[in-house]
Swiss-Prot record:
Glycans are attached at N285, N332, N415, N799, N849. PANTHER family: HISTIDINE KINASE 4 (PTHR43719:SF51), TWO-COMPONENT HISTIDINE KINASE (PTHR43719). Keywords: Calcium, Endoplasmic reticulum, Glycoprotein, Hydrolase, Kinase, Magnesium, Membrane, Metal-binding, Phosphoprotein, Receptor, Repeat, Transferase, Transmembrane, Transmembrane helix. Autophosphorylated predominantly on His residues. Activation probably requires a transfer of a phosphate group between a His in the transmitter domain and an Asp of the receiver domain. This is Histidine kinase CRE1. Trans-zeatin binds at D196, L218, T228. It catalyses: ATP + protein L-histidine = ADP + protein N-phospho-L-histidine. The modification 4-aspartylphosphate is found at D912. The gene is CRE1. Homodimer. Coiled coil: none annotated. It comes from Medicago truncatula (Barrel medic). The chain crosses the membrane at residues 37-57, 333-353. CDD domains: HATPase_EvgS-ArcB-TorS-like, HisKA, REC_hyHK_CKI1_RcsC-like. Cytokinins (CK) receptor related to bacterial two-component regulators. Functions as a histidine kinase and transmits the stress signal to a downstream MAPK cascade. This protein undergoes an ATP-dependent autophosphorylation at a conserved histidine residue in the kinase core, and a phosphoryl group is then transferred to a conserved aspartate residue in the receiver domain.
Length: 1003
């Protein structure tokens, strides 16, 4: 009743319950129901709003059209400006060439090769190269002192532009050579005009072409300009100064450009030139621009103009072209029609919405009722999940009491029948609590209450433990069960070891259940080394494929772990060997791991579980991850199970930040793979992880050499992986004769030969050489000089009969037979027995002497058990007393504080987490505070630092999720032990407090 009342109070505060109460207590109206009178007003508002939007659309489109019109005008204007500039540049180059001609043949040669007749004839015949020039002429530079001599020599009088005798000046520039079209310029002083004089002086000072301002040309009365180039009487230095240029100047070549004709010809060559109007200006004086072409009066569309710069080669003068459209832009009918169409469409939409609003008002009451029913259903579903998740502790507690009492009962004196009954009840209880745990885990996931731990753990040790769970079943079926972890995977990762173990256990358990021959292979590597398995493979078989599979060549020669075909064809020896080669390409594996720890905060691992079982029918593959779903009804009848394991595994994988997929082929097998994100543990893995999950493998085998004889390369690589974990150097041979050849002949001590200390022979390889061949190889070994270094012979077998065992002994395997699946700790224990190295010691999670070791640790120790449940106290006290401990009990945290007042004689305390009044966390915090106070008083009295009081406190919990590793450490606990007490868990919990640390063996 108390539990139900507690659940009821919790549900009353649930958001869905509150929502349901609000809806049932007060009927809520939606916006449309509450404002139905506003529907007509909203319709008018909609019309106004759509009219405004249509106006905005028209404006946007009209602006876009104007922008495009402006861009077109700019493009056309720039095109004309470039063409005018290019044609002008060509004519300028011809005038420059004429200036060089005069300089070369008139001044560089003596006597001159040019006279008026020659110049006139040459310029007339080459006039086609200067179509833009009305004429060219050459004016000689004459200083005042040379004027009289010049006039006598040429028989002329230097005149001004007005045809009058030129007055006395410092310098003159009379024309001596002229084209026939401008013959009227002969003897006229080109420097008689003020502007002309400045242009000529600027030309000789710069050595470049100069232009005059626009003026009316004689004869044509068109606007034009005069281009002037200096002519030099001697060659100039590479970089002449202004004085050198003026001194070397002998005359000037000039040409007149008819700008109006030039632009008219240019525009006539362009299509559509009537569309725009062009004006050319001299803007040297920006305040008073001079027109060179075009109408001075504004015509056309003056609202849009474009200016293009012109460069005629004279940096002093600036010119530009201004363009505008000949006609104004027409109305934008496209924008107008689009805006009107948009307005009409939106008006229709508004009318439809108005009608829909009226209809919604009518059906809103029905919708409100349906919504209320939906909330009720959701509240009931959440209440169910919340109830199951909340009572998980209460359900587990009596079950743990039953299992604990059965465990204590089995330690008493029982006859065979009683022991059989008790063992059967214990097995059924464990199966029941496992099923309860799965159902509660699913409920926690649905309720969103499942939390993941983040503690350091040894992933390889976890996988070895999973294999040990199914070792008996795999041996009974004759299955190859193996695990392989890439060297790139860190030794220690941060994550939830329990949930990781649960996922792998579910997948391996399913594989063992549905596999009758072949193998089950677990592989772990970094996700970057392998593309994830997708469901695309079985789609290929589904589309046109059959569920009947034909095995290749009898199905027992494929390069897989067992030789049977696997569902995922990528898991063959070639890809597996490539993965191993990638690992060995780098340097030492530990160096790689340290490097990875320095640059990455987390690592993504991919775990593949491959089997050669019955596979999954294609019709069931789409729903395989649904809860409580199996392939068909016959699966449950033949194999048992609830169909919830894969569903929970999928949820756990997603909580770990990964994905789970599979490839399955009926009668071939299945390959499940999942990825998961783990943190990288950067602290000292030995000192920190020993507290939780760390497999302390022996180091006494480092430096030993071994040969693995196995004809299956994948299986040999797995054996090599486990031996490498023990520090053994390994070579692989596919036959015993190859193993002998590895060591050479007649000289085992020769340099460079591989002298093995141990030879591991797979049972298959031994059976192949059973008829005397193996003994012959041994004799050959002895005859080849190995008589004093005969290695230890160890046989590896999945299962072996008594007859086969006797034959193995007679064949030379007198040392031992290791039964698979292989685990590093188990192999290490066997090697210690075979080689006689070291004493028996703890290997991973295996206790050296079973209950005797726990008894040796706990015998005579005074231990306090704190738990509010009397059954739990009796179970814990009984288990600890069975191991020789002196146990006292307390039923609450307050009672524990009273019993632990200093001084006390307790060696350890087992503390329950969930207790009334004061839970285990709060009790632990207060105990640690009492210890700090006692330590301070002791140190102050003694004057020196003594050993501090620290009572080992271990959390007792039936649900580790509520007592995570971080929470235990935060409140001061030293670890936890799960209920009910089992020897393995109890040994791990107390060993580090009561056992002296073993001395390390140097490698």
């Amino acid at each position: 009743m108390g539990l139900l009342l507690k659940m009821k109070m919790q549900n009353q505060h649930h958001p869905l319950a509150s929502k349901l109460q609000e809806q049932t207590g007060n009927k809520r109206y939606t916006f449309i129901q509450a404002h139905r009178a506003w529907l007509l007003k909203l319709m008018f508002l909609w019309i106004l709003l759509m009219a405004l939007i249509s106006r905005i659309i028209y404006s946007k489109m009209d602006v876009g059209t104007k922008v495009r019109r402006k861009e077109v005008l700019g493009s056309l204007c720039d095109q004309r400006a470039r063409m005018l500039q290019d044609q002008f540049s060509v004519s300028v180059n011809h005038v420059h060439a004429l200036a060089i001609l005069v300089s070369t043949f008139h001044y560089y040669r003596n006597p001159s090769a040019i006279d008026q007749e020659t110049f006139a004839e040459y310029t007339a015949r080459t006039a086609f190269e200067r179509p833009l020039l009305s004429g060219v002429a050459y004016a000689q530079r004459v200083v005042n002192s040379e004027r009289e001599q010049f006039e006598k020599q040429h028989g002329v009088v230097i005149k001004t532009m007005e045809r009058e005798a030129s007055p006395v000046r410092d310098e003159y520039a009379p024309v001596i050579f002229a084209q026939e079209t401008v013959s009227y310029l002969e003897s006229i002083d080109m420097m008689s005009g003020e502007e002309d004089r400045e242009n000529i002086m600027r030309a000789r000072a710069t050595g470049k072409a100069v232009l005059t301002s626009p003026f009316r040309l004689l004869g044509s009365h068109h606007l034009g300009v005069v281009l002037t180039f200096p002519v030099y009487k001697s060659k100039l230095p590479p970089n002449p100064t202004t004085e050198e240029l003026i001194k070397a100047t002998a005359g000037y070549v000039g040409g007149s450009f008819d700008v109006e004709s030039l632009v008219e010809n240019l525009l006539g060559q362009l299509a559509g030139h009537q569309a725009i109007l062009v004006n050319v200006y001299d803007v040297t004086n920006s305040s008073d621009p001079l027109i060179m072409y075009g109408n001075q009066y504004e015509e056309g569309d003056v609202s849009l103009v474009h200016e293009s710069k012109l460069d005629f080669g004279d940096p002093y003068r600036k010119h530009q072209m201004i363009c505008r459209y000949h006609q104004k832009a027409p109305p934008n009918w496209t924008a107008l029609s689009t805006a009107i169409l948009f307005f009409v469409i939106l008006l229709l939409i508004g009318y439809i919405l108005y009608g829909a609003g009226n209809h919604i008002v009518k059906v809103e009451d029905d919708f409100h009722e349906m919504q209320e029913l939906k909330v009720r259903a959701e509240a009931a579903d959440v209440a169910k999940s919340q109830f199951l998740a909340t009572v998980s502790h209460e359900i587990r507690t009596p079950m743990n009491g039953i299992l604990g009492m059965l465990g204590l009962l089995l330690r008493t004196e029982l006859n065979s029948t009683q022991r059989d009954y008790a063992q059967t009840a214990q097995a059924c209880g464990k199966a029941l609590i496992a099923l309860i745990n799965e159902v509660l885990d699913r409920a926690k996931i649905e309720a969103g209450k499942l939390e993941l731990e983040a503690v350091p753990f040894d992933l390889r040790s976890i996988l070895d433990d999973v294999l040990s769970l199914f070792s008996e079943k795999s041996r009974h079926k004759g299955l190859e069960l193996a695990v392989f972890v890439s060297d790139k995977v860190p030794d220690i990762v941060m994550g939830d070891p329990g949930r990781f173990r649960q996922i792998v256990t579910n997948l391996v358990g399913n594989s063992v259940k549905f596999t009758e021959r072949g193998h089950i292979f677990v592989k772990v590597h970094l996700s970057e080394n392998r593309k994830p398995v997708t469901n695309g493979k079985h789609e290929t078989y589904r589309n046109g494929g059959s569920e009947e599979v034909v095995h290749a060549s009898g199905g027992y020669n494929l390069k897989t772990l067992s030789g049977y075909e696997a569902a995922d064809e990528r898991n063959n020896w070639d890809n597996f060997n490539h993965l191993i080669a990638d690992e060995e390409f780098f340097c030492d594996a530990s160096t790689k791991k340290v490097a990875s720890n320095e640059f990455y905060e987390q690592v993504t691992l991919m775990v593949c579980v491959e089997d050669t079982g019955i596979g999954i029918p294609f019709s069931a593959q789409d729903r395989i991850f649904m809860p409580f779903v199996q392939a068909d009804s016959s699966t449950s009848r033949n194999y048992g199970g609830t169909g919830i394991g894969l569903s929970i595994s999928k949820c756990l994988v997603e909580l770990m930040g990964g994905q789970i997929n599979f490839i399955s082929r009926p009668q071939v097998g299945s390959t499940f793979s999942f990825t998961a994100d783990f943190g990288i543990f950067k602290k000292n893995p030995i000192t920190e992880v020993k507290k939780v999950n760390y497999e302390d493998l022996p180091s006494s085998f480092r430096g030993l050499k071994a040969v693995v004889v196995d004809g299956k390369p994948v299986r040999a690589a797995v054996t090599r992986y486990h031996l490498k974990r023990l520090g053994i150097q390994v070579k692989v041979a596919n036959a015993i004769n190859k193993a002998v050849s590895l060591c050479g002949k007649n000289g085992a001590s020769s340099t460079g030969l591989f002298q093995p200390d141990i030879i591991f022979v797979e049972k298959d390889s031994w059976v192949c050489g059973e008829d005397g061949i193996f003994s012959v190889r041994q004799l050959d070994w002895k005859q080849n000089g190995h008589i004093f270094k005969m290695p230890q012979m160890i046989l590896l077998a999945t299962n072996i009969s008594n007859d086969e065992f006797d034959k193995a002994k007679s064949a030379g395997f007198s040392d031992t037979v290791i039964m698979k699946p292989l685990r590093a700790s188990m192999v290490g224990a066997c090697l210690q027995q075979v080689l006689g190295t070291g004493k028996k010691r703890q290997l991973g999670k295996e206790m050296p002497n079973g209950s005797t070791s726990v008894r040796s640790l706990l015998f005579g120790k005074k231990i306090l058990v704190v738990d509010d449940n009397v059954v739990n106290r009796r179970v814990a006290a009984g288990a600890l007393k069975n191991f020789g401990a002196d146990v006292k009990c307390a039923d609450s945290g307050k009672a524990a504080l009273e019993m632990l007042q200093f001084p006390h004689k307790f060696d350890a305390c087992f503390m329950d987490i969930q207790m009334p009044e004061m839970d285990g966390f709060e009790a632990t915090r207060r105990i640690r505070e009492m210890e700090r106070t006692a330590n301070e008083e002791t140190n102050s009295e003694c004057g020196e630092r003594k050993s501090e009081f620290h009572l080992p406190i271990l959390a007792m919990t039936a649900d580790v999720i509520h007592a995570t590793y971080e929470e235990c450490l935060k409140c001061g606990m030293d670890g936890y032990v799960s209920k009910p007490f089992e020897e393995e868990n109890l040994y791990q919990a107390v060993a580090k407090f009561f056992q002296t640390k073993p001395t390390s063996v140097d490698s």
